[in-house]
Amino acid sequence: MVKLPAISKKPREIAKQKIIELAKKMYEDLMKGKRPKITMPIRSLSNAMFDKEKGSFTLVGKEKARTLTVNQAKIFAQTTKMLEFAKQLLETDDFSTLREAYYVSKNWGEARFDDQQASNNVIEDLEAALGVLREHLGFIPEEDGSSVVGPLKIIEETPEGELVVDCTKLGTGAYNIPNDVTKLNLETDADFILAIETSGMFARLNAERFWDKHNCILVSLKGVPARATRRFIKRLHEEHDLPVLVFTDGDPYGYLNIYRTLKVGSGKAIHLADKLSIPAARLIGVTPQDIIDYDLPTHPLKEQDIKRIKDGLKNDDFVRSFPEWQKALKQMLDMGVRAEQQSLAKYGLKYVVNTYLPEKIKDESTWLP
């Protein structure tokens, strides 16, 4: 097993210092008779371009400013109050769920939030303004990450001492990825990571000990992967130089929402593309060609599927940067059908374990970039 040094509290210390620097700048502006402001990059694909060389989206520099004016008085107050709350969390080494942060604001008088989405948006704006992850500011989502199993040891420092989880000794269960993966120390001698769209397929592969037969780490994405899941996979990939193979349903959602988010990021978190995206990831299936080659049971494309494909071909810089993806999506459009991972059960419950995945993993020419 390759062991890395334990992760320190440095990210939270950096976040705290950035909060202090921003507050100091606003104070200096006030003392000079200027309106204090908080500048942040615009968090949307309109402020990004796909850099094929890097394999991820890059911000193009569009910014917005939150200024202490009559029109922005409330949102500015909400932003500074949230900044203060984040500083308190870091100073006390505490955390707040996004839901808790919303309710904390109910004690802020006129600066309170009317709904949680507005509160979440301010937290993500601060994340963008400071250039740090919201988790490093002390804010975590309600949901945990996904499940993981395989040749991996996870070491976590707890108040009771060092906790070691051996992901090969969990019976039929799996390790649940926590919200903040920064504090985890990871040891592995696996050959690759297999990220799986559905919990059902993950359960099948785990039950058959696919990870043991192929010396790989299995990660359940549970649909579009949560931030914690993406950061966990990215750490394993970068720290242990592990290839990341992705196994989704053969449909536009699996390709352009789930796989695309893991590989190059999402529009909402475009400012974090370098911290969350995994450009080296590859999709091994289910591809449109697999549907033909393996004669899989199918369902007709829905209207929303067709719309998603056409939009991707026309407007998605990721798709437009890869001829292989353009060809695959046009092929699916011509076929007019989609297929689920579980459709491989047509040939028996163990077919995906004994035949399909071993063949796909071995033949890189069938992968999509």
Swiss-Prot record:
Q: The organism sits in which domain of life?
A: Archaea
Q: Which UniProt keywords apply?
A: ATP-binding, DNA-binding, Isomerase, Magnesium, Metal-binding, Nucleotide-binding, Topoisomerase
Describe how the cofactor binds: Mg(2+) is directly coordinated by Glu-197 and Asp-249 as well as indirectly coordinated through 2 water molecules by Asp-251.
Annotated active site residues, numbered on this chain, are 103 (o-(5'-phospho-dna)-tyrosine intermediate)
Q: What GO MF annotations does this protein's record show? A: ATP binding; DNA binding; DNA topoisomerase type II (double strand cut, ATP-hydrolyzing) activity; magnesium ion binding
* Residues the entry annotates as binding Mg(2+): 197, 249
Task: Tell me what reaction this enzyme catalyses.
Answer: ATP-dependent breakage, passage and rejoining of double-stranded DNA
Q: Which Pfam families match?
A: TOP6A-Spo11_Toprim, Topo_VI_alpha, TP6A_N
A GO CC term? chromosome
Name what cofactor the protein needs. Answer: Mg(2+)
- Tell me its EC number(s), please: 5.6.2.2
The UniProt entry's GO biological process terms, in alphabetical order, are: DNA topological change
Domain Topo IIA-type catalytic as annotated: residue spans: 10-146
Outline the subunit composition: Homodimer. Heterotetramer of two Top6A and two Top6B chains.
Outline what the protein does.
Relaxes both positive and negative superturns and exhibits a strong decatenase activity.
Tell me the NCBIfam families matching this sequence.
PRK04342.1-6
Q: Which family does it belong to?
A: Belongs to the TOP6A family.
List the HAMAP family hit by this protein, alphabetically.
Top6A
What is this protein called in UniProt?
Type 2 DNA topoisomerase 6 subunit A
